[in-house]
């Protein structure tokens, strides 16, 4: 609760029991909220450890977001009873695919494999087999494992740690399609035409044996360098099919954004050693297209058989967001077609307009923000971004609960039955959508903390970057190469009245005419990295449209070594919250108007005077000392900053 910005008094009994030490992170329950002359009181319930301990950022995020991270005793007992191999009795009613050369293609660090693929040419058509781990065979509705899985609804992925949806002996064991062992699976067997249309498909339970555990980079090397391998022929067939499906995707008008993903490499202490870009090659896209095809078939199968299930719905822009997008695009000389109801094709055409522009990635963010969030719902509204009339998640039942329910619904149709979850479909959709967002928020918190920790050693160093966002209180800059965002406060832009002009997405100086635009290249110095708020402050060295008029410190004056990285951009909305930068009011020379939301030196003096008066009044009051033991609580929630306007950028 960010309203609790003051110290919290802990109950003496709980303090005596846990004996926390200074610098430790604790978990406490609020007993009474603060009143006019009484602080909040909390009960200490857990001591997590020292703030600098390896993995502490994950422990904090788990508790901040209330992530279930320990399986119930009943779930653990039930999981132990699950066999570690396929039994003869499990094969009843299943198609035998053990001799079909299915392979898994995943990342180098993947541990759970829930999908395998196979493709072959049949005349002018292709046969595509997508085999998915049959989790529903082992996790039955409303049993102890299912109860815990539904509560979690998704696996949560942190750097160096995963909180799985299922117990490990299922997620990495009997349900994982590991190589050279028998596994139960649900299969989507498709025939795809030369034009990329799914001519026919069928679902059936099967038993399989993965013939190889391949990686994306390995497969890409075979494709690009024509290297020989026993599975090379099948990979070539899969790649030809992928190119057909990719062409169909473009014809369909699916919106496709290109962004740079990053990977954190850690040292032995669990802290970031370096951040490197992850190259997304055609091997990644190949598997993605295979999974999309199976997901579409699952949605159509359930609709055709009139069985309720959780569909993955993604709606287009709301009228308000559409109007905002059109206004911003117009100022940039761009236009979105489609009138009041633009289609995915209109969005795809817009993306083609700005391809190659220096601000292309920022325009992608604007387009994404105009769309609504994808959710799980028991009715089908289609998927705007993928340009599908019907879409469901079928391919990841090990890590997503909605996929598990889709498997159960498909099996029910095959057995001429009906599957109804204990929680009604609508409530289940709301719950699983919430858990998905919660997991994303927790992962983002941890990544931001780790990035901030990494930047602590870079304070004083100079980086090149690109303006990736702006508000009435400053500029957000994404640093080249390391893809980390920081804030340059508007009061640090120079000796002028700087105003934020949202209608043109620019910050402009009144007298100098200096303008900062989205996508502009700038040089910045790292001023501060605040671990409590996971925010990074930067100061401007050079940049803007009238650089010669600005009085700023040069690189030579600062004596800092300039770090120049390769130009790249990672879309990371979570880092777009500024932190308060403490500077003496006398040194703040920027002059700003009230609407710019910047504290001037005069305002600083007034605040200082008020603070002194308040202190004097407090000294005159005769207060009785509290008998409670007072310990300042460290949490991952950020306390509100004092500077006016330093709110989270939306």
Regions found by a protein language model. Give the residues of each.
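Conserved, carboxylate-rich catalytic/transport cores that coordinate ions
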Residues: 1-592, 606-607, 620-623, 627, ...
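Short terminal targeting/anchoring segments and short Lys/Arg-rich nucleic-acid-contact patches
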Residues: 574, 598-602
């Amino acid at each position: 609760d960010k309203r609790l910005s003051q110290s919290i008094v802990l109950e003496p009994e709980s303090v005596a029991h846990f004996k926390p030490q200074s610098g430790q992170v604790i978990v406490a329950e609020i007993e009474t909220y603060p009143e006019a002359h009484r602080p909040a009181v909390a009960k200490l319930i857990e001591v997590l450890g020292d703030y600098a301990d390896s993995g502490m950022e994950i422990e904090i995020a788990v508790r901040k977001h209330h992530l279930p991270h320990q399986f119930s005793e009943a779930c653990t007992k039930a999981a132990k009873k699950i066999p570690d191999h396929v039994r003869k009795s499990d094969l009843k009613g299943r198609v035998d695919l053990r001799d079909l050369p299915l392979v898994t293609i995943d990342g180098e660090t993947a541990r759970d494999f829930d999908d395998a693929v196979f493709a072959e040419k049949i005349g002018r058509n292709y046969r595509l087999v997508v085999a998915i781990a049959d989790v529903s065979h082992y996790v039955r509705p409303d049993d102890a494992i299912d109860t815990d899985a539904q509560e979690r609804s998704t696996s949560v992925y942190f750097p160096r740690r995963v909180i799985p949806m299922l117990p490990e002996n299922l997620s990495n064991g009997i349900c994982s399609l590991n190589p050279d062992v028998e596994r139960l699976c649900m299969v989507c067997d498709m025939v795809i035409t030369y034009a990329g249309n799914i001519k026919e498909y069928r679902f059936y339970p099967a038993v399989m044996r993965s013939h190889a555990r391949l990686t994306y980079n390995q497969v890409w090397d075979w494709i690009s360098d024509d290297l020989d391998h026993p599975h090379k022929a099948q990979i070539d067939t899969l790649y030809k099919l992928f190119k057909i499906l990719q062409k169909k995707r473009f014809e369909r008008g699916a919106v496709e954004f290109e962004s740079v993903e990053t990977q954190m490499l850690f040292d032995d202490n669990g802290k970031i050693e370096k951040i490197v870009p992850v190259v997304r090659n055609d091997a990644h896209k190949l598997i993605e297209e295979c999974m999309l095809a199976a997901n579409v078939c699952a949605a159509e199968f359930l609709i055709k058989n009139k069985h309720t299930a959780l569909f993955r719905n993604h709606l287009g822009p709301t009228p308000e967001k559409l109007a905002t997008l059109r206004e911003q695009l117009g100022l940039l000389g761009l236009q979105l077609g489609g009138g009041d109801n633009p289609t995915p094709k209109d969005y795809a055409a817009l993306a083609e307009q700005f391809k190659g522009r220096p601000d292309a990635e920022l325009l992608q963010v604007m387009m994404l923000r105009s769309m609504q969030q994808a959710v799980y719902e028991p009715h089908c509204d289609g998927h705007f971004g993928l340009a599908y009339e019907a879409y469901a998640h079928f391919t990841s039942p090990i890590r997503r609960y909605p996929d598990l329910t889709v498997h159960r619904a498909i099996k029910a149709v095959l057995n001429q039955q009906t599957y109804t979850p204990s929680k009604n479909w609508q409530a289940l959709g709301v719950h699983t959508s919430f858990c998905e967002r919660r997991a994303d928020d927790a992962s983002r918190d941890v990544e931001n903390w780790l990035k901030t920790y990494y930047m602590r050693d870079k304070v004083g160093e100079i980086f090149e970057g690109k303006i990736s966002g702006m508000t009435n209180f400053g500029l957000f800059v994404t640093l080249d190469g390391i893809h980390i965002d920081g804030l340059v406060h508007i009061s640090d832009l120079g000796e002028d009245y700087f105003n934020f002009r949202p209608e043109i997405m620019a910050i402009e100086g009144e007298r100098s005419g200096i303008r900062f635009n989205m996508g502009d290249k700038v040089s910045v110095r790292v001023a501060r990295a605040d671990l409590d708020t996971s925010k990074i402050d930067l100061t401007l060295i050079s940049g803007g449209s009238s650089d010669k008029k600005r009085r700023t410190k040069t690189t030579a004056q600062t004596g800092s070594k300039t770090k120049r990285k390769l130009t790249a951009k990672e879309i990371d909305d979570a880092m777009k919250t500024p932190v308060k930068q403490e500077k003496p009011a006398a040194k703040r020379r920027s002059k700003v108007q009230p609407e710019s939301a910047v504290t001037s030196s005069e305002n600083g003096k007034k605040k200082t005077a008020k603070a002194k008066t308040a202190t004097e009044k407090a000294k005159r009051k005769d207060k009785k000392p509290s008998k409670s033991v007072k310990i300042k609580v460290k949490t991952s929630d950020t306390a509100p900053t004092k500077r006016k306007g330093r709110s989270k950028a939306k």
